[in-house]
Amino acid sequence: MGGISIWQLLIIAVIVVLLFGTNKLRTLGSDLGASVKGFKKAMGDENQKETNNAEKTTNDADFDTKNLAQKTSTEEKSTTESKNKEQV
């Protein structure tokens, strides 16, 4: 009841085409598409910069990170060595 029906949208579209012409609408559409494409590219570049900055900040330390399996194996070795020393 309160919304715009399909017939009203078609009438508005016909009036817009008559006022501006198809050529002007075509150039307007291509300009709009180019601006949206440029905006998406700029946003992608911004996200790329953020990820590069995040990678740089996470790799600030001068030491190599150890694998979790390597950590557990070295901890197991140290506990067995301490048990052997206590038993002696």
Curated annotation (Swiss-Prot):
<keyword id="KW-0653">Protein transport</keyword>
<keyword id="KW-0812">Transmembrane</keyword>
<comment type="similarity">
    <text>Belongs to the TatA/E family.</text>
</comment>
<dbReference type="InterPro" id="IPR006312">
    <property type="entry name" value="TatA/E"/>
</dbReference>
<dbReference type="GO" id="GO:0043953">
    <property type="term" value="P:protein transport by the Tat complex"/>
</dbReference>
<keyword id="KW-0813">Transport</keyword>
<comment type="function">
    <text>Part of the twin-arginine translocation (Tat) system that transports large folded proteins containing a characteristic twin-arginine motif in their signal peptide across membranes. TatA could form the protein-conducting channel of the Tat system.</text>
</comment>
<dbReference type="Pfam" id="PF02416">
    <property type="entry name" value="TatA_B_E"/>
</dbReference>
<comment type="subunit">
    <text>The Tat system comprises two distinct complexes: a TatABC complex, containing multiple copies of TatA, TatB and TatC subunits, and a separate TatA complex, containing only TatA subunits. Substrates initially bind to the TatABC complex, which probably triggers association of the separate TatA complex to form the active translocon.</text>
</comment>
<feature type="compositionally biased region" description="Basic and acidic residues">
    <location>
        <begin position="73"/>
        <end position="88"/>
    </location>
</feature>
<keyword id="KW-0997">Cell inner membrane</keyword>
<dbReference type="InterPro" id="IPR003369">
    <property type="entry name" value="TatA/B/E"/>
</dbReference>
<dbReference type="GO" id="GO:0033281">
    <property type="term" value="C:TAT protein transport complex"/>
</dbReference>
<keyword id="KW-0472">Membrane</keyword>
<protein>
    <recommendedName>
        <fullName>Sec-independent protein translocase protein TatA</fullName>
    </recommendedName>
</protein>
<dbReference type="GO" id="GO:0008320">
    <property type="term" value="F:protein transmembrane transporter activity"/>
</dbReference>
<feature type="compositionally biased region" description="Basic and acidic residues">
    <location>
        <begin position="42"/>
        <end position="65"/>
    </location>
</feature>
<keyword id="KW-1133">Transmembrane helix</keyword>
<feature type="transmembrane region" description="Helical">
    <location>
        <begin position="1"/>
        <end position="21"/>
    </location>
</feature>
<keyword id="KW-1003">Cell membrane</keyword>
<feature type="region of interest" description="Disordered">
    <location>
        <begin position="41"/>
        <end position="88"/>
    </location>
</feature>
<keyword id="KW-0811">Translocation</keyword>
